[in-house]
Structure formats: structure tokens, C-alpha cells
Amino acid sequence: MRLLSFIYLVWLALLTGTPQVSATDNGKTSDVAWDKYSLSVKGERLFVFSGEFHYQRLPVPELWLDVFQKLRANGFNTISVYFFWSYHSASEDVFDFTTGAHDIQRLFDYAKQAGLYVIARAGPYCNAETSAGGFALWAANGQMGSERTSDEAYYKKWKPWILEVGKIIAANQITNGGPVILNQHENELQETTYDSNDTKVIYMEQVAKAFEEAGVVVPSSHNEKGMRTVSWSTDYKNVGGAVNVYGLDSYPGSLSCANPNSGFNLLRTYYQWFQNYSYTQPEYLAEFEGGWFQPWGGSFYDSCASELSPEFADVYYKNNIGSRVTLHNIYMTFGGTNWGHSAAPVVYTSYDYGSPLRETREIRDKLKQTKLLGLFTRVSKDLLKTYMEGNGTSYTSDDSIYTWALRNPDSDAGFYVVAHNTSSSREVTTFSLNITTSAGALTIPDIELDGRQSKIIVTDYSIGSESSLLYSSAEVLTYATLDVDVLVFYLNAGQKGAFVFKDAPADLKYQTYGNSNLSALETSQGTQYSYTQGEGVTAVKFSNGVLVYLLDKETAWNFFAPPTVSSPTVAPNEHILVFGPYLVRGASIKHDTVEIVGDNSNSTSIEIYTGDEHVKKVSWNGNLIDTRATAYGSLIGTVPGAEDIEISLPSLSSWKAQDTLPEISPDYDDSRWTICNKTTSVNSVAPLSLPVLYSGDYGYHTGTKIYRGRFDGQNATGANVTVQNGVAAGWAAWLNGAYVGGFSGDPDKVASWEVLKFNHSSLRSRDNVLTIITDYTGHDQNSQKPIGTQNPRGIMGATLIGGGNFTLWRIQGNAGGEKNIDPVRGPMNEGGLYGERMGWHLPGYQVPESALDSSPLEGVSGAEGRFYTTSFQLDLEEDLDVPIGLQLSAPAGTEAVVQIFMNGYQFGHYLPHIGPQSLFPFPPGVIYNRGQNSLAISMWALTDAGARLEQVELKAYAKYRSGFDFNRDWTYLQPGWKDRTEYA
């Protein structure tokens, strides 16, 4: 393989004369340019270390900054963001970009404030396991025609969206002082016909033109759906529709929640793929596995150890570095919550995703491990221009080790990425590595790899203005150019490391402070310093001024290099070094004080190196702490945690209950409901009976729908009913108030066909009423047959058995349908249960005296429904971040549909018979940490066995003393109850 690589390089040199390639731009702006090595922003090469974030899944704008600060602190310089059309458009030609969490200008402002670039992804189609893939639900009833093509019907629907959201994206481009550096066209749209007249090609041209019309000038991108097709690259069969920067999506883990030993098989073909299909462009992994979604009936994220492992981040992300990737987006980095009815049927309420940052905004070990790579790429400028020197198993003394060898053609810096050839191996292997350096060919002995570990070995690596490494078998975490050059290494505890300074004096003296003792060995290439990594922080001060920190991996997890600048790019002299806390959000130096803002769960020691001899004091979240100075120039102290604070959450009591299924009664007045009188549908899927009963045809798209069908006579013995509301969605039916059957939902079935059997004694000679109540788990994605996102929802067909026909059907759904009567929470928050339509879930609702004193623990004894409400007070300390959730459980065999509403937000869809989720977190802003909270639970039984819960309990996940303000006035996000009688 090394010989082949050499031949390739000779051929490349003959062909081009030089390995350098001048930067290319799109002709609209030179602020963002690219070549085959990397992206350049404002003339500076950038390693795009990006995390996927969906603001819709966290409907509290202030918390976007919380997440962004955590990403910035953990080495990210960019976020990738979907903009869901569905969230901003409740009805045709109506857009909301200003109300509550719909205000995306705040998203851009917070990203800029946090020091993050933005990759904008506005579709029109997004997927992201969101309902209808992000299409506006009003358009997903069939009226779009052939979606994701040049179909005129589709074009007329999506173009206004792109023009509106595009204007805001354009206003926030890097060219206008904003953070947007790339703009994605569409999403995972597979190009299968390379013909300029192909409908998809025309469509991609239309999307490009629409963004251009909106004023977007930054380079365009796209994300290939795995290595299945080759789509929209200027370097491969470009007949139109191609983007400027080609990207690839890859989820290669093949991990199993049930079996942590399965999967973990690396793909080592990214380099070849990009060389074949986008060779003039930098390698861009537009979505790379940060976790994986879980379906109804699957596993819950917290129990999926294989997806949560920091080893995954270590091995897989470094493999991408070895493949020459320089644009790297982790999907998801923060998943959030599918609150309301925003989920596609393939996922449940939680969209935690097993991501590095938990749904509760807590930092997982996976994020701590990811940080080690993020901080490394931030300072490793030579990594941004490399060629593939070679790869394979011949670089080491043990052929069980695979090596990527990258070389910078200008500086000759080398990057050797080593891992087990069998990536799932748990063997501990010691080997030597053959390297090429400015001092010639060398061999580094005694490199150790634990199972499922990878390392980046550097050669001729600059660590400051006057210092370089000839090589190091310890991994570089970061370096800083301060009063002296400061270098930070890390290794697993107990592993051996060695490094050699380049062109350093032979008689260097050093002093060690800590548990890792250094030894020096003179070689022909210089002095090799060797050590065995101990636990904690070890500092080594050399007589030439260089300061080296040696950290074990777990200590490195709690190391931060907070920038002293606000820009996403951070030079080695623009950050300081902090060891110890759970999180460092930011740092600044004012006179003789370094001011640090951060979070801590437990009291910890803290060490700060600023390189400023005038700094004598440390403040933590505004409070000075006692410190002592070390002999090598740092300050050490202790920062407080929250371990001594008792969190006492109230028990939930004083429940009130009301009937939320009054429509079961044949005497219920439905005269104001929508009459189902259509004999044709806008949908191309033909109904199984008439009139059309698709809910979307009548303007009801989300949540529970209720149908009431009337017929005369006593001849009917039953009814054939087919319902399609997404996998796991159940439904139930009542004839004249008597339960007659239904379907409890199945995670493997998108629709159900059931025969309802009527009891003759329940029939009346005139005006029989069949009431059908349906659950809903979302609109399908584009890939679901027959017509993707436009697959109908509701009753597909309903016919009587034994004679007679239905004489009238009426439907009721969410209050107001497409009117969006609660614009703050938006068009997907509510469904059509009576309690929802009446606003019983909203703050300020006054329960009537007629309400029952009953709790969800009592439940219902038959096929009934109840809406339970209570309130509780929280009074957490002001400087605490305490993620809080609601724990539910139900007796085995319970078949019911349960929803949780916290201060009006539907933040839990619980199906106890399907699962897996039973603990539902609420972010601050949805829940008041210091104030009054309104909690509502709707529950209806899917069978006549009834339903109840056996646990309804507030639960604290953890507690952190925080420098972020989580206790604000959230009133603007929680509009209260208003009379809704008209929607009865």
C-alpha cells in the first residue's frame, strides 16, 4: 500500500507540478473558499469541527446559548442546523420567524455570541426523523404532487418557504458579519439519472435559484445518503444541480444496544470515496454518527451503552481524521426532544439520540472524549493541508495495527493515526511505529493501544513560536503560545509515552511536578523523554521555558482551553488552560484577575495557566477563590460543587380529573364540528370508502383525531375500519357509548384494518353514532411507501357490515386546525382530545368544582379517558441547574395513550404497552425551577380493561452549580388559558 501511495504521489506531482492547489470560490463571495484540502474562511484554513443542533427540539431560546457554550467549550467551532418548514408554517403562505422559539434570528445571534459558525440546512426537505421530514403539514396532505421533484405543484408549495427562510439566512452570512459559512441544498437526495432534463436535476437547480433569489451567496453543499449513489458533485457527471462542496452522510457503527460487543466495525473507504467523486473539494462528512435514533418498542437511549461509549468517539472520529476529512459534523451532538407531535413515526418523544450532549443538556463522557479531538484540530493547522502518504498494516511491527499516514507538503508535518486493524478488538497491543521525519526514517518503540482505542502520532509538529516536536507517541491535546510554549499531552493511565523536541539543546534541564516521572535518553536525533502516565496532572518545566502537561485520559476529560476571543477560530495565543471542573464556559483576564465562568457538580480542584505574570487572582462565577501559585506559573484552588445541596422535589397531589372523551356519548353535540363531505381527495392515494375521511383533507394534521359517523337502522352487525396514523398509533371505537373494539398499536404496523362487532342491543332504529378516536405518531418520511410524507392520516375507510351505509361523518382535531391559535408553542403542540381543545393543559386554567378528586394512579376502569391536572411549586437555588423529568410507570398489560403537558407544552407521549420511554425531561423555560408549574396528564384506555398509572413522580437527574442563568422570567414562552368553547 505504501508503494502504491508513492506511485500515486509521483503521478500527482507529474500531473500538477506541485501538490498545492489554489483556493476556489463560487463566484459570489471569496469569504468562504475551498480546495482539495480544506475550507477557508476569510482567507484562513479552517478545520470545521461541527455539531448538529435542532433548535425546534429545544423550545427555549435562552437555552440555545447554554448548548452553544457547552459545544464551544468542548472544542466545536461550528453548528449544523436544520430549519423545519413545519415548525414555522401552520398554513399556506403564513410564516412565523418571531414568536417564542420560532425567532431564528436569536439562533444566529447566540451562535455568533458563543463563537460558532453555522451550516444552514433549510431543505425544503430535511428528514431528521421529524414529522413529514420537515415539510409543512398543511402541504403534506397530498397537494404537493410528486415531492422532491420539479413537479409544478410541489414547486409552488416549497418556494415561498425557501424565499422567506433564505432571506434570514442571507442576512446572517459571513459576508454580512454573521456566522453562516455554508448553505445546504435539500437533504440526502439521491441522484440516479445523470441527465440535465431529469426532474431531480431541474429541482436542485430550482432550489439553488431560490436561495440565490433570497440573497444567499455562501457556498452550497449537499449530503450524500451513505455510499449508495453519487449525487450533486461537480467532480462526477455534473449535468446540473451540483453544489459547491460535496458531503457524505455515514452511520457506520452497526452497534447494538442489546449486545455491546457487536458492531464497532470501521469503514476505511472514505478517502477513496472522496478521491473518486469529489477530488477537487475538501472531504466533508456532513453527518457522521454521533448516536442513532431508537424506534417505538426499541431501547431507551440511557440504556444503550454501545452508543454512549467514549471509545466510539475516540476510534471512529480519529479514523475520519486519518481519512483526510477536514469538515466533520457529528449528528446528533445535542438531540433534544420530539415534543408535541413533531416526531416522525420512526421515533418516540425523546430524541436524545445517544448524542454526546444528553437530552437534559448534561455532558456525557462521549462529549468529553470528543473534546480531545476538537481541541487538537483547533490548533493543528498543518492538519488542514495534507496528502495521503500511505495506509495499511505495514507501518508497525504488529500487523494487527492499521495506520493512516498523512503529510503536510509545506511543513513536512506528519500525522499517523493508529488503531487495531480489527476495530472491534479489545486486545491490548504494544508495537513500534515506523515514521518519516525531518531527521530521517525513525522507529518509535513501545506504543500501547488498549482495545477500542486510537491514537494520533505527530511528527515535525509545531507547538509554538519557537518549539516543535520531532515526534511524540503521547497524544497532543492542545498547545498554547503564552509567555512560554505550553504543550498538553494525554494517554490512558499506565500507558507509556515518549517525545523528542526538534532542534532542542542537548543539555535541557527539567523539573517534574506530579505522578508521571520523566526519564531522558540521548539519541542521535535528540533527547527522548519517556514516562509512564500516572493519574492526575503532571507538569514538566524545561529549562528552555517550555512547559509540558501530562494528563491521563480521565483528567483530560476535565481539561478546557477557553478562548479569550469570540471568533470561532482560535490561535494558540488566544486561549488559556484550565484543569479540573465539569465545564468551563468562558474565561477573560481583567487586570490581575482571571474570571472564569463554568459549572460544577462536585467540588473540584482547579488549575489555571494564563501565561500572564500579572494575574494573581481567580474568580469563579463572579466569586474570588483562594489560590496558591505553583513553581511553574499556574494558580491552583478549589471551586464549589452542588454535592452538599439537598434537592427536595414535591410529591404530586391534589389532582383533579375530568372526562376527556365526552364524545363517546351518542348525545354529544358535534354540530360545530367539520363535516366530512368530500368525495374526492387531494391525495393520490384513493380512500377505501366515501366520503373521504383523511384528516388532512379537513385541515387537521397533528395529534388525536375524533370521528363520529352516523347511520340508521339495526341491521348492521359491525364495521370494517382501516386507520393509518403512524406506527404504534392505536385507536378505539364506541357505538352509542358502548366500546366495540379498536387497535392498540404496533411498532411494526403503519396501518390497521379491524372488524368492529356490534351488539344488536346497542343499536337504535335511527341516528346510531360510531365514535372513533385515533392516536397519532407523526407523518411519514419520504422513504415510506406509497407516497412518503403525503401518506394519508386518519381513517382510510369505514363501511358497515350487514347492511346500510353511514349517512354523515364529522371530524374534530386540534383546536382551530391550521389557525395556529397558540403561536408560541406552535402548530404541532396539540391534538384533538377534548381537554386539549378546551385548553385544560394551559397555565391559568381554573378547574370547575364539578371536577373529580382523582389522580392518574386511580385511572379509569373501562374504555374511558380522563384529563388530570395539578400544580406544584419549585424553589431551587438561583445558581443551580437541575434537569428535572417526570417518571411514569403503569401496571403490566396496560394499553393506553398517555400525554404529559408541562405548562402547556406536550413533552411526553407515553405508550406503556409499547415503550420504551417512561422518564420525560423538561428543560428550564418549559418548567419553572423557581415558581409555579401547571402539570396535566391525559390518559385514555385502548381497551375496556381500563388503564391507570402506578407511578407519577418528579425526578432530578443531577445538580450543578452553574454560571449560566437558568432562572429567568419565562412568561413569554408560557401564554395562559383563554376560553375555547367554540372548539368543543
From Swiss-Prot:
Keyword Disulfide bond appears in the UniProt entry: yes
Keywords: Carbohydrate metabolism, Disulfide bond, Glycoprotein, Glycosidase, Hydrolase, Polysaccharide degradation, Secreted, Signal
Transmembrane segments: none
GO biological process, one term: polysaccharide catabolic process
Entry GO terms, CC: extracellular region
Catalytic reaction annotation: Hydrolysis of terminal non-reducing beta-D-galactose residues in beta-D-galactosides
Domain of life, per lineage: Eukaryota
Disulfide bonds, paired cysteine numbers: 257-304
GO molecular function: beta-galactosidase activity
Pfam family, one: BetaGal_dom3
E.C. no: 3.2.1.23
Localization per record: Secreted
Top EC group: hydrolase
Signal peptide: 1-23
List of glycosylated residues: 197, 276, 391, 421, 434, 517, 602, 677, 715, 720, 759, 805
Entry annotation: catalytic residues: 188 (proton donor), 287 (nucleophile)
Amino-acid positions noted as binding substrate in the UniProt annotation, renumbered to this chain: 82, 127-129, 187, 251, 353
PANTHER family: BETA-GALACTOSIDASE RELATED (PTHR23421)
Summary of the function given for this chain in its UniProt record: Cleaves beta-linked terminal galactosyl residues from gangliosides, glycoproteins, and glycosaminoglycans.
Family according to the record: Belongs to the glycosyl hydrolase 35 family.
This protein's name: Probable beta-galactosidase C
Lineage of producing organism: Eukaryota, Fungi, Dikarya, Ascomycota, Pezizomycotina
